[in-house]
């Protein structure tokens, strides 16, 4: 899969930078990997539930070419002070202080471990447009970028699902975050103006046209610093696993995603701990909420869809406790504005971004009003972007 890139100015600048860093631009190939938003279905992916994400046009661009030796040379426009990071193909152990290059190493390790031959070094220059710690999946975007780069340079012909799974494996086993498959799947399988209803239990999925009529999806960035590995993400993972384990003493289930709300409520005595009950209740209710939301979305009932966004945020705040002052201020202020059908945090939480479904004609006033309240409450400004739904990770045709 390849697309003709639209932003030639960005590529021209990156091409010049590649020549400056690596000497020339002979045989350079161009790649792009998006970020993602999750419309609804939060913290359900690692609980065997449904998610409803879409890839966005903000992402990570890469320029790459093969070398004849085994040296890997990396440069990021986002971290110029790090300069060129260099390592040998046979020395791919994770290193502290080399945060972004660890994702490259991880993908090399996972692809080689899956039996794919990567026998030469390469040069890779990247530029990420996704704000770090925004909850728009800058790490998964980079993993899938590296995946499509290596797939192309070495003619590996890796099936897209396997590439997505190796991206998740990099996150879980190499980086050390117990994430589900939502981010990598959305980024690997994304299509222009389509969202993905994904059953994370079976990996069956449905592409759903995004028909918003007179509404826009506005991304609201808290600009709060956050690192997923330092957050309570892994703690929530462990809590829902423990709740599942306790419910399995009587129920024949493999994941919380198999339960209806009624089945869950009838068996909370098995869990016996109020915190664990709250965590599991969010996973179950959010999963069922996501299925209802997708049906409303397809039917064009954006009002109902918006109400479910609001309910999702409330559950993430009260039961899963992953929001905090910044996300609550954005989402709850957004919900009160004219022309807004719904708003919720998106991503892992603990900072990052929220999204709102806003009438197109109200967007400017919305951003001003929410931005003003946020800065008054939090003490620094939020950032706002209107989301554009774009393609998944791909090689670019540069003419």
UniProtKB/Swiss-Prot annotation:
Substrate binds at residues 42-45, 233. It is found in: Cytoplasm. Mg(2+) binds at residues 139, 171. It is an enzyme of class 2 (transferase). GO terms for biological process: galactose metabolic process. GO terms for molecular function: ATP binding; galactokinase activity; magnesium ion binding. It catalyses: alpha-D-galactose + ATP = alpha-D-galactose 1-phosphate + ADP + H(+). Its main location: cytoplasm. InterPro entries: Galactokinase, Galactokinase_bac, Galactokinase_CS, GalKase_N, GHMP_kinase_C_dom, GHMP_kinase_C_sf, GHMP_kinase_N_dom, GHMP_knse_ATP-bd_CS. GO terms for cellular component: cytosol. The active site is at 183 (proton acceptor). Belongs to the GHMP kinase family. GalK subfamily. Catalyzes the transfer of the gamma-phosphate of ATP to D-galactose to form alpha-D-galactose-1-phosphate (Gal-1-P). This is Galactokinase. The gene is galK.
């Amino acid at each position: 899969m390849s697309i003709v890139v639209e932003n030639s100015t960005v590529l021209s600048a990156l091409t010049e930078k590649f020549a400056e860093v690596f000497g020339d631009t002979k045989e350079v190939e161009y790649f792009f990997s998006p970020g993602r938003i999750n419309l609804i279905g939060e913290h359900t992916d690692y609980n065997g539930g449904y998610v409803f994400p879409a890839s966005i046009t903000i992402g990570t661009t890469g320029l790459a070419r093969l070398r004849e030796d085994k040296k890997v040379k990396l440069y990021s426009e986002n971290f110029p002070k790090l300069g060129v990071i260099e390592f040998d193909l046979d020395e791919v152990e994770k290193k502290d202080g080399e945060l972004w290059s660890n994702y490259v190493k991880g993908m090399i390790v996972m692809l080689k471990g899956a039996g794919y031959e990567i026998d030469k070094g390469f040069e890779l220059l990247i530029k990420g447009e996704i704000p770090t710690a925004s909850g728009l999946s800058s790490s998964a975007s980079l993993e899938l970028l590296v995946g499509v780069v290596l797939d192309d340079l070495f003619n590996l012909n890796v099936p897209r699902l396997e590439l997505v799974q190796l991206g998740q494996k990099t996150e879980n086993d190499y980086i050390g975050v117990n994430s589900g498959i939502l981010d990598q799947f959305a980024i690997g399988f994304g299509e222009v103006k389509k969202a993905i209803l994904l059953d994370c239990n079976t990996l069956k999925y449905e592409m759903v046209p995004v028909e918003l009529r007179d509404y826009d999806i506005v991304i609201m960035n808290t600009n709060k610093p956050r690192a997923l590995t330092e957050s309570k993400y892994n703690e929530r993972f462990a809590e829902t696993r423990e709740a599942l384990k306790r419910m399995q003493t009587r129920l024949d289930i493999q994941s919380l995603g198999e339960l209806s709300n009624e089945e869950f409520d009838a068996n909370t005595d098995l869990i016996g701990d109020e915190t664990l009950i709250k965590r599991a209740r969010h996973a179950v209710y959010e999963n069922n909420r996501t299925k209802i939301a997708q049906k409303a979305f397809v039917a064009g009932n954006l009002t109902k869809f918006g109400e479910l966004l609001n309910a999702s945020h409330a559950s993430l705040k009260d039961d899963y406790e992953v929001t905090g002052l910044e996300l609550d201020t954005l989402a709850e202020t957004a919900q009160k504005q004219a022309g807004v059908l719904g708003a919720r945090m998106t991503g892992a939480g603990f900072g990052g971004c929220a999204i709102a479904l806003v009438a197109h004609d109200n967007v400017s006033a919305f951003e001003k009003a929410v931005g003003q309240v946020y800065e008054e409450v939090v003490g620094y400004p939020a950032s706002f972007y209107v989301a554009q739904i774009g393609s998944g990770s791909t090689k670019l045709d540069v003419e």
